[in-house]
Structure formats: C-alpha cells, structure tokens
C-alpha cells in the first residue's frame, strides 16, 4: 500500500509527523504538505503565482517528503498529477489536524479539503482531526488510523468517499468506542476584534467559540461530546436532494 500524507498545519507540525511515522507500519509513506500553516483555507487552489515543491528532511525519519508553497488541495493535486504520476498512491490520509473538524467545519477545513481533492481525483481518502497538541494523544489517533486502513481490505472501492475521523481529546481509557456518524451542526459565536494600523485604518481579527446546539444523536458532534471516536463518510456532491423536486416543479422560464 502506498500512502500519501498531507495536512493543513504545515509539514513540520507534530500531528503529521506522528501520523506519517505510524503509517510506515501499514505501507510506503510519502509526505507532501504545505510549507507553512494553511488552516481554514478550505478548498482553495493557487492560480496567481507559481507553485514550488521542494524535498525536505522529515524530522528524524527517512520518509520521502516534500513541502509546497500552496494549499492542502494544491499539495494533493501536484503530488498525484506530477510527483506520483507514475506511482499512484493507494490512499490519501490528511492530518492529524490540531483541532476538530466536525459538522460544517468540513467546509472551512484545509485538512478535509485535501481529502476531498483526493476523492475528486478518484482516490480513497481519510481526514483525521483532534483538538490537542499532545504527542501521546496523537499517537493513539495515529494507531487508530493504522487499524482502520488495515481493516479496510478493499480501500480502493471507496474511491469516491472521504472518511472524516474525529478523535476525542480525553484519556485513552475513557474513550467509549467508535461510531459511524453523520455531519452535525457546528456554528460559532464570531467575534471581530478591531484594531488600527499606524495610518489609522481599521483592520480585524476574527475569532469566536463554538455554540452549544442541540444535535442529532447520530451526529459527529454528539459522538465526540459522548466520548466516542467519530467516523463520517462524506462526499463532494453537495446537491440538496430534499429541494431538488421542489425546484423542478417550479414554473421556471428563461
């Protein structure tokens, strides 16, 4: 198995190091990741300046690794269509993200968008996230991804599926199990912090916190709240089928 690993926290983030190192027990690992943090860039791609890819020494390992001056989606595109054109990966794994990607977070997430890009290019993919920067907790999450890949014998059959994994940030002994979930609702109380530059012009920092909302008991948000590992199969087809027939029945004219 050939595993392409990426993230949105940057190639020298602890999460990707732990993940890539653990995945060596499952197959051949190649890392292609942004040269700096690109969190919450969504599915953006670089069109107005050149992309550059450079080989890097990946921490204390001998893993083949490259940094890219672009987004997570850029990393997947250039890896699959240029670098690995003649040695196609079996699967793409994105993470371990420092922060959860639950519910509507997936629309903002560079971590998830990298996995979505892989699915667009007909490769199965996994995105893995957790709200921690503790090495021991990353290790448990990485071990779980290795088990998931080992148990998914025919991963190629999931080429149009993104498996979005969220791992709870609690002691390993407190994790109750694993749940297959749907995307929940994740909204934020946004706060815009206004400041002035030296010329007196206003600029803003956006911040905020997740709102406590009622959740479907089958949702990823609820699973994490209940101390379960959440696995959500997602897809890049955003068609809202509930409204499809209603719109078709409208008397629309050009």
Swiss-Prot record:
Cofactors demanded by this protein: a divalent metal cation
InterPro entries: SurE, SurE-like_Pase/nucleotidase, SurE-like_sf
Keyword line: Cytoplasm, Hydrolase, Metal-binding, Nucleotide-binding
Taxonomy, superkingdom: Bacteria
Binding-site residues for a divalent metal cation, renumbered to this chain: 8-9, 39, 97
A Pfam short name: SurE
Cofactor detail note: Binds 1 divalent metal cation per subunit.
GO molecular function, one term: metal ion binding
Catalysed transformations (reactions): a ribonucleoside 5'-phosphate + H2O = a ribonucleoside + phosphate
EC number(s) recorded for this UniProt protein: 3.1.3.5
Gene Ontology cellular-component terms listed: cytoplasm
Broad enzyme group: hydrolase
Localization: Cytoplasm
Protein family: Belongs to the SurE nucleotidase family.
Known role: Nucleotidase that shows phosphatase activity on nucleoside 5'-monophosphates.
Name of the featured protein: 5'-nucleotidase SurE
Organism of derivation: Alkaliphilus metalliredigens (strain QYMF)
């Amino acid at each position: 198995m050939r595993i392409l690993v990426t993230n949105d926290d940057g190639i020298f983030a602890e999460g990707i190091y732990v993940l890539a190192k653990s995945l060596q027990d499952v197959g051949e690992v190649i890392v292609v990741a942004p040269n700096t943090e690109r969190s919450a860039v969504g599915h953006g791609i670089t069109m107005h300046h050149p992309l550059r890819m450079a080989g890097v020494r990946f921490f204390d390992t001998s893993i083949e690794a490259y940094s890219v001056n672009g987004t997570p989606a850029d990393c997947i595109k250039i890896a699959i269509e240029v670098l690995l054109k003649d040695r196609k990966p079996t699967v793409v794994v994105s993470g371990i993200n420092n922060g959860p990607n639950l519910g509507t977070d997936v629309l903002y997430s560079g971590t998830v968008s990298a996995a979505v890009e892989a699915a667009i290019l007909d490769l199965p993919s996994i995105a893995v996230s957790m709200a921690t920067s503790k090495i021991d907790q990353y290790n448990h999450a990485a071990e779980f991804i290795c088990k998931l890949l080992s148990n998914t014998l025919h991963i190629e059959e999931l080429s149009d599926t993104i498996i979005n994994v969220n791992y709870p940030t609690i002691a390993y002994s407190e994790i109750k199990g694993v749940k297959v979930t749907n995307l929940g609702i994740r909204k934020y109380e946004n706060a815009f912090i206004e400041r002035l530059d030296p010329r007196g012009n206003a600029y803003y920092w956006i911040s905020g916190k997740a709102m406590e909302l009622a959740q479907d008991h089958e949702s990823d948000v609820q699973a994490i709240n209940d101390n379960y590992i959440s696995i959500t199969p997602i897809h890049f087809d955003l068609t809202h089928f509930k409204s499809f027939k209603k719109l078709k029945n409208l008397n629309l004219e050009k």
